Amino acid sequence: MGTGVGQTRAEIAQARRVVVKVGSSSLTTPQGGLDHERIRDLTDVLAERRKAGTEVVLVSSGAVAAGMAPLGLTQRPRDLATQQAAASVGQGLLLARYTAEFARHSLTAAQILLTADDLMRRAQYRNAQRAMSRLLEIGAVPIVNENDTVATHEIRFGDNDRLAALVAHLLRADVLVLLTDVDALYDGNPSLPTSTRITQVNGPEDLVGVDLGSANKRGVGTGGMITKVESARIATEAGVATVLTSAANARAALRGDPVGTFFVPAKHRRPSSRQLWLAHATAGRGSVFLDPGAVHAVVTEKASLLPAGVIKVEGDFNAGDPVDLRDENGVLVARGLVNYDSAEIPDLMGRSTRWLARELGAEYSREIVHRDDLVVLRNGSTSDREAC
């Protein structure tokens, strides 16, 4: 666990491009409506940084919260349909507020709504990358949110923390700032005087034994401290320095002041956005078990998973779903997007692709999981294949 301010924290003030994520609890009143004063304070900070020459992207939650009051909801809805209804009402209200506040600084706000699928598919990924990059070039401030109205339970971020980390990767940002309602990561309950602020995290090993618990206090947002730390991990694996602190510390964090918790970025090759999503932002819909030869091929040789190496299937999933790849003892070794329904795989197990093509047709000679749709999990980190 780090005890001091890292050398790279001071470089935040010179960052060329920053992504700032703010959660619902930092934008709303105790009653759940939009807090215009908080939004104004945040836009003042971001406008100040933008005018200093830094490209700024804001990932903002709050659409569901903003839509609650107009729909007569007193508590955040738990079912997806009502969440989507609230988001469809609230997203326009949220953007209108940001547009008005940034206009005070002669800046233009631009709405970007993304789904996990947009960052999983190469063409959509590139389109999102080009659109946001162009907005930054012409001086606008992209405001990103998950497209809650069309996202599904199966393929969604569920909170904007992980979305922010993947956007930081997509845009090759220098810094990610995660703003929440606590001032830092602590080694215990932050409300207890015995808890100590963690000033710097150099790697996952620094958090072994730390009880992350939940930072949610008001029931407005969806992300707790666990998802924020996971998002910091995604970003730092992509080489993006990350600061976790409260919205009240936004200005200080962007100056590189020693506030909050600083997560030191990794220095290895950047993984692809798809690999980061598979490793960190989704759960397997089922499991495919591999024999030792297949484990070696997938993990060491970075090969695709072929039917011949499969020994068992568990769960109910469809082609295109993420699945966990496990060795014969059940140890998770990789995760990938499967090419077959779970009901189809038992008839393919142990067979060569040549036999399958001859007996069942060419459509059954495909890999179970193609190497381009697969991420090897080693001690919780992604493999070092080329970034997309």
Curated annotation (Swiss-Prot):
Gene Ontology BP annotations: L-proline biosynthetic process
PUA domain ranges (all copies): 285-363
CDD domains, alphabetized: AAK_G5K_ProB, PUA_G5K
Annotated GO CC locations: cytosol
Localization: Cytoplasm
Keywords attached to this entry: Amino-acid biosynthesis, ATP-binding, Cytoplasm, Kinase, Nucleotide-binding, Proline biosynthesis, Transferase
Ranges in a coiled coil: none
Residues binding ATP, per UniProt: 21, 180-181, 222-228
Chief location bin: cytoplasm
Binding site for substrate: 61, 148, 160
Database matches in InterPro entries: AceGlu_kinase-like_sf, Asp/Glu/Uridylate_kinase, G5K_ProB, Glu/AcGlu_kinase, Glu_5kinase, Glu_5kinase/COase_Synthase, PUA, PUA-like_sf
Enzyme category, top tier: transferase
Entry EC no(s): 2.7.2.11
SUPFAM superfamilies named among the record's database cross-references: Carbamate kinase-like (SSF53633), PUA domain-like (SSF88697)
SMART domains, per database record: PUA
GO molecular function: ATP binding; glutamate 5-kinase activity; RNA binding
Role played: Catalyzes the transfer of a phosphate group to glutamate to form L-glutamate 5-phosphate.
Family according to the record: Belongs to the glutamate 5-kinase family.
Listed name of the protein: Glutamate 5-kinase
